[in-house]
Amino acid sequence: MPLRGAIVVMRGAILAMALAFSVAGTSYAQRIAPFDRLAGNWSGSGTIELSNGSHETIRCRAAYDVLREHSKLQLSIRCAGEGANFDLRANADYSAGAISGYWSESSRGASGTISGRADGDRFQVVARAASFVATLTLVTHGGRQSVTIRSQDPQSTIKAVSVNLRRTS
């Protein structure tokens, strides 16, 4: 019986340590400001879905600069394909889970506001302009990131953009 009791105590100690490390890891992950996960340069490829139903392969580069106590972000996402290009820039602020800021897209001369939420590794943002609304979902897992942009404007020549990126620095 003494051996059996020692095994039970050892299992309990291992379980307690595992629980302590998982809680510590979770609280550490929650302390990381959402923009910190994005910082750096990224590149990859994806597709643009055009309003006529066709798809075009694109290559993309993204740069994220985190500023002022990890609550401000400047981003640039440039993508190019054979016929469709875009150059998206934004400045965003983060506070208590909420994201707000401004965006511009130079090849179409469009600009407007962004608003949304950050939850862990996921950003869900709505970009608005005078006659344009799009949703942007950005998910980061370590050195990988997916970006999906969907136009809510039926007149837009681009319906959706889907890009997978890898951190380069």
Which role fits each region the language model picked out?
Residues 1-9:
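N-terminal secretory signal peptides that target proteins for export/translocation
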Residues 11-22:
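Bacterial N-terminal signal peptides
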Residues 24-29:
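Sec/Tat signal peptide C-region and signal peptidase I cleavage site
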Residues 31-139, 150-169:
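Central antiparallel beta-sheet cores of small beta-barrel/beta-sandwich binding domains
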